[in-house]
């Protein structure tokens, strides 16, 4: 499990490094307003994309089940259906994001000195949605059969290109947020092209052929049955984050910029933990498909132990060096001070979020996707919205806003554990 996880962890960390380069270059060479513009769009981007990227979880779980039961024909059907689905959803997202970027940013109350730059960034960024979804679906397909190395290779190549284009477009051509967005879109299309090339030319068990690129209704139904709840769960979290971002916007551009920088630092910790979540889905899914009940439990417990260790190590380390890390993003004392407040509330206990996600992965691995979605709706989104409209309304500080995160993690984690125990006990004994 650890061997499987390492390339996924490295992929996640590399992805965040490249994203951090975007923010660092913008913050240092285009100003704090541009930094706030790029950072303030992350929750909105996640809101748009999580539903569709969640569908890739359906592909991952389904292929893992078919691999476990050695059903090669259905593996092939799932691969081709998934890629077509990624293209369709990507085009839809591009159009929707381009049209609704500015109205939603206004609805979120983005500061006046930020909104035009944020709109420009979003409109360019959303042109890369087809590529982003193709890469995510392709990587999910490869992970389902235990191949975590090639997505790492492709991400590295495209990420290096992203950094070079950032330096060229932002520093040399002074294109600001537009340059960062263009660099991101170009690198995303490169990673998508590489993963399509690998599936078409190099992979035998997941062979992608143009003539077979069509949607199989049965496979689509099953991918949606697992993927839509997974995507809705991500969207639910993003929706609550959009509401929180709107509240953060009310504190001004310095707090928005500091929050954005800290969220990027958090992203490194989260990506490391998210790799364990993805590992749990694959290992639990394959063992569930093969009827190995005891291994399902063993994989879940191992994943929980690993994610707590990883979350504590990276989270506490990031907190200890938070001042130095924040100075990389901005030299403004006000921005750094605002960022440190969020660091104190989130980073030392961020492992709780990872533990919660692993339980979600285990539930999805045994075919339960609706339950974690509903649990997250109540434990994350509803609780945070209630918190903002009651406690935060009475005590309007950023700290009172940020503490809603760990409270929601603890409550949701307890619920996920209870549901996993319930559904695990319902797995037939003859599958052992």
Residue ranges with predicted function:
Residues 30-43, 118, 122, 181, ...:
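Small-residue hotspots at the loop-to-helix junctions and early N-terminal turns
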Residues 1-29, 43-58, 62, 87-94, ...:
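N-terminal transmembrane alpha-helices
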Residues 47-50, 162-166, 192-196, 268-271, ...:
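Hydrophobic transmembrane alpha-helices of multi-pass small-molecule transporters
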Residues 56, 125-143, 151-159, 180-193, ...:
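Short runs within selected transmembrane alpha-helices of multi-pass transporters and secretion channels
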Residues 35-95, 132-151, 245, 258-322, ...:
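Small-residue-rich hydrophobic transmembrane alpha-helices
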Residues 1-5, 63-128, 172-228, 284-349, ...:
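Short alpha-helical transmembrane segments in multi-pass integral membrane proteins
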């Amino acid at each position: 499990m650890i061997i499987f996880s390492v390339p996924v962890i490295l992929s996640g960390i590399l992805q965040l490094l490249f994203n951090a380069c975007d923010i660092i270059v913008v913050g240092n060479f285009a100003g704090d307003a541009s930094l706030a513009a790029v950072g303030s769009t992350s929750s909105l981007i996640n809101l748009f994309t999580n539903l569709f990227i969640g569908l890739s979880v359906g592909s991952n779980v389904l292929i893992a089940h078919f691999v476990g039961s050695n059903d090669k024909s259905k593996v092939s059907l799932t691969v081709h259906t998934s890629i077509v689905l990624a293209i369709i959803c990507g085009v839809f997202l591009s159009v929707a994001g381009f049209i609704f970027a500015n109205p939603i940013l206004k609805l979120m109350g983005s500061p006046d000195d930020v909104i035009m730059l944020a709109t420009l960034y979003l409109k360019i960024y959303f042109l890369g949605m087809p590529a982003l979804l193709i890469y995510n679906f392709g990587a999910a397909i490869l992970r389902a059969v235990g191949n975590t190395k090639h997505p790492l290779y492709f991400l590295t190549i495209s990420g290096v290109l992203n950094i070079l284009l950032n330096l060229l477009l932002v520093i040399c051509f002074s294109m600001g947020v537009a340059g960062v967005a263009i660099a991101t879109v170009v690198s995303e299309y490169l990673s998508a092209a590489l993963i399509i090339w690998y599936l078409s030319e190099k992979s035998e068990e997941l062979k992608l052929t143009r003539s077979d690129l069509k949607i199989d209704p049965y496979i689509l139904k099953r991918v949606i049955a697992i993927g839509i709840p997974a995507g809705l769960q991500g969207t639910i979290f993003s929706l609550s984050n959009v509401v929180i971002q709107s509240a953060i916007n009310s504190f001004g551009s310095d707090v928005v910029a500091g929050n954005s920088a800290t969220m990027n630092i958090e992203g490194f910790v989260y990506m490391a933990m998210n790799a364990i979540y993805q590992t749990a889905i694959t290992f639990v899914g394959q063992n569930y498909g093969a009827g190995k009940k005891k291994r399902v439990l063993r994989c879940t417990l191992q994943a929980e132990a690993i994610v707590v260790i990883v979350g504590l190590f990276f989270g506490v380390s990031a907190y200890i060096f938070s001042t130095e890390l924040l100075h990389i993003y901005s030299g403004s004392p006000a921005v750094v001070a605002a960022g440190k407040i969020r660091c104190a509330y989130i980073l030392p206990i961020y492992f709780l979020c990872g533990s919660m996600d692993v339980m979600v992965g285990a539930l999805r691995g045994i075919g339960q996707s609706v339950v974690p979605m509903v649990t997250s709706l109540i434990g994350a989104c509803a609780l945070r919205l209630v918190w903002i409209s009651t406690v935060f309304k009475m005590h309007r500080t950023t700290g009172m806003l940020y503490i809603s995160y760990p409270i929601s993690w603890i409550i949701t984690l307890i619920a996920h554990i209870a549901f996993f125990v319930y559904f695990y006990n319902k797995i037939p004994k003859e599958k052992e």
